[in-house]
Every structure is written in structure tokens, then in C-alpha cells.
């Protein structure tokens, strides 16, 4: 793809904004939900809210895998971390995610064996380095990450490793969108669909949006022009009432996605119901290791019982933020007891979290309040 010059980018942006303004009816409010944490960050970094007509409202959805990881899952991870014979392997952004009573970073200061890894396949090396320990990998993430973790499960199985286990809490994006629409708590006029997830699953899993709910959507890339192009596409659908799954990320996302990755996921996992932080259990929105790989499912191989109930942080509105019902700045804890240095909720922990993005980029020009 040709790299645009700065002037060409400016010209393209001007043309897209002119098109968006022409498609938007003055006085009409249009609420579009971006379903990707990377989109949330890009929208802030590129200053897109300030460029769009005032009636177009961009709200963040459940697009951050760390943020949607359920409280009970974190409590289970912490329970395994307390075992002397266990090493927790995890991505770094999970360290500060609060459980009901602690976090992995706090557990680490108290002696828990926690290793931050950068690729899932590192668990193979950990298992060989510490053969006397049980390596428990915190397997979270959307479809993009799932495909990579599938390869790790198969590698562990092929190597015959007996000391590697997975605490699984993968999430599937399309069922979450259906759940949001079924709840009908917050009005959504269209979805800006995630680029990376769509590389794996393609366009077809989103077809229920236009066919059943008559709502426009568009798969988008991650720079400002690609997001503006998706917004224009959605507004065009609204104007013509010709609702489809748009795709302005054709260079990367194919209609049928990545069949090889899809086949691998089906080989390793079964679909199951799963709990999303602040939202509850969503049917068919999670994955569970197939019986063939049950020996690597830590909850089946090394079952534990949580002695205390899982509790959401008092006052935290993360669940409402994830559903687009409120903006982060409308949470009473935001910027007060909940900050980037001292996060109370998961949405403030991850760099892709809505609250973290609002905290970093959403400061008003006055320097004392956040833009609402």
C-alpha cells in the first residue's frame, strides 16, 4: 500500500470529514460504539472527537480483553499463585488487574512466583527450566490471541509436557455485541468493528447485526483515516437504510477471515458460556479446552475452591463503561481514587482500557477536569 504524504493525509481527512458532515443530519444524535481498545486509543490520539460533528457520539465498548476478564477469574489466578508448587505465566498487563482482595503484583511482592511473558510459547521454556513446578498460563484474549494460544496448547501436547496448564478465559466478540443489543439499556446506532479480531473471523460472524437487528457496522483499521472512513460508511448505511457489514480494512481483513486459524481454534476449543466483567454470563461467548486437551486445563487437572466470594471493587463502574452506558469520566472514582498509578478497576489497568485512555488523553485544556 502506498504511504501517503502529510499533505495527502490532510486532503483525505478533509474529504472524509466533508462527506461525514454531508451525511449527518443537523441536530441528530448518532451513537457509534467502537469495539476495540486500540480504536479507543487511536480516536483520542488522533483527536477525532473534536473533528466530528457534535451530534456524532463515539462510545467505547467491551473491546479490551484485560478489562472484560471476570473478577472470579482473577481470584482463581490469585489462588493458584498462592501455591508454592505453581509458577504463574502471564502477560504484563494482567499484573495490576484487581481481584476481590488482591492483585498479581501484590501477590508477587509477597513471594508468589509470577513470570511475565511476551509470547505464549515461552511457557514451553519455563516448563523445562522449572520441571519441579507447575506452570499455569493465564490464557485470556479475543480471537486474535486465541489463535496464538492454540498453537501453544498443541506444542505443549506434542512435546508431552506434564507440568504446563492453562487457566482459560477467552472471549468471543460477536456474542458480546448481541448481548449488548439484547439488553437494550444503551442505544447504539452502529458499530465500528475491530480490525485485528476480524482478521481471524472475517465478516460473516457479524452478519446478524444487519440481518436481525438492522444496525449498520463497519470493520476499521487503526489510523485516523481508516476510522473516519468506517464512520462515513456507517452513516451512508443509515442514510440509505441498506444495512450491511461494511469493511474499510480490505487490505487486511478477508470476507471469510483466516480459515487456518479458525480450524485450529475449533480443533483445540469448544464454545461455552462465559462471564464478562460487569456484564454477566453471555451465552456462547467463551471457550473451553476440548476433552482431548483436558489434562492441560488447570481447573480440571488441579481444581480449587475459592473460600471467599468474588466481589467487584466498591463504587467501580467498569461494567457500565464496558457497555457504553456511561463515559469513564462519569464514574465517581475516575481521577480520584482510581488513577493510572492506583487503578481500582480493570478498565484503568490496560493501556487499551477505556478509562486508561480517557485518563491519558481526555484531560481538558484547563488541566483540572476530564472532557465528558
Where are these regions (language model features)?
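Phosphate/pyrophosphate-binding betaalpha-module
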Residues: 138, 142-205
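Metallocofactor- and cofactor-centric catalytic cores in central/energy metabolism, strongly enriched
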Residues: 1-132, 146, 156-158, 167, ...
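Hydrophobic alpha-helical scaffolding
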Residues: 6, 67, 138, 142, ...
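Internal helical hairpin/lid segments
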Residues: 229-320
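A conserved active-site cap/scaffold subdomain adjacent to cofactor or substrate pockets
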Residues: 167, 185-254
Amino acid at each position: 500500500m502506498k504511504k501517503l504524504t502529510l499533505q495527502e493525509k490532510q486532503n483525505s481527512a478533509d474529504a472524509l470529514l466533508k462527506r461525514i458532515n454531508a451525511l449527518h443530519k443537523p441536530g441528530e444524535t448518532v451513537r457509534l460504539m467502537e469495539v476495540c481498545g486500540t480504536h479507543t486509543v487511536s480516536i483520542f490520539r488522533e483527536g477525532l472527537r473534536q473533528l466530528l460533528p457534535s451530534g456524532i457520539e463515539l462510545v467505547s465498548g467491551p473491546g479490551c480483553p484485560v478489562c472484560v476478564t471476570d473478577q472470579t477469574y482473577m481470584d482463581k489466578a490469585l489462588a493458584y499463585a498462592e501455591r508454592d508448587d505453581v509458577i504463574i505465566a502471564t502477560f504484563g498487563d494482567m499484573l495490576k488487574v484487581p481481584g476481590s482482595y488482591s492483585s498479581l503484583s501484590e501477590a508477587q511482592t509477597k513471594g508468589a512466583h509470577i513470570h511475565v511473558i511476551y509470547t505464549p510459547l515461552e511457557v514451553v521454556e519455563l516448563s523445562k527450566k522449572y520441571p519441579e513446578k507447575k506452570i499455569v498460563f493465564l490464557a485470556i484474549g479475543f480471537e486474535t490471541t486465541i489463535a496464538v494460544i492454540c498453537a501453544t496448547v498443541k506444542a505443549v501436547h506434542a512435546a508431552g509436557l506434564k507440568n504446563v496448564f492453562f487457566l482459560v478465559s477467552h472471549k468471543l466478540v460477536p456474542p458480546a455485541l448481541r448481548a449488548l443489543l439484547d439488553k437494550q439499556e444503551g442505544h447504539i446506532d452502529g458499530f465500528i468493528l475491530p480490525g485485528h479480531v476480524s482478521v481471524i473471523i472475517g465478516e460473516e460472524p457479524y452478519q446478524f447485526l444487519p440481518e436481525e437487528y438492522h444496525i449498520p457496522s463497519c470493520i476499521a483499521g487503526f489510523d485516523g483515516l481508516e476510522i473516519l472512513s468506517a464512520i462515513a460508511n456507517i452513516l451512508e448505511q443509515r442514510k440509505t437504510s441498506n444495512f450491511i457489514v461494511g469493511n474499510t480494512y480490505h487490505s487486511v481483513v478477508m470476507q471469510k477471515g483466516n480459515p487456518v486459524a479458525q480450524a485450529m481454534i475449533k480443533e483445540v476449543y469448544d464454545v461455552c458460556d462465559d462471564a464478562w466483567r460487569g456484564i454477566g454470563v453471555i451465552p456462547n461467548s467463551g471457550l473451553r479446552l476440548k476433552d482431548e486437551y483436558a489434562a492441560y486445563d488447570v481447573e480440571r487437572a488441579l481444581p480449587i475452591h475459592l473460600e471467599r466470594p468474588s466481589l467487584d471493587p466498591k463504587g467501580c463502574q467498569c461494567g457500565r463503561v464496558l457497555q457504553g452506558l456511561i463515559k469513564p469520566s462519569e464514574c465517581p472514582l475516575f481521577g480520584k481514587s482510581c488513577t493510572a498509578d492506583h487503578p481500582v478497576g480493570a478498565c484503568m489497568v490496560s493501556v487499551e482500557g477505556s478509562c486508561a485512555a480517557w485518563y491519558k488523553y481526555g484531560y481538558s485544556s484547563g488541566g483540572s477536569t476530564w472532557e465528558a
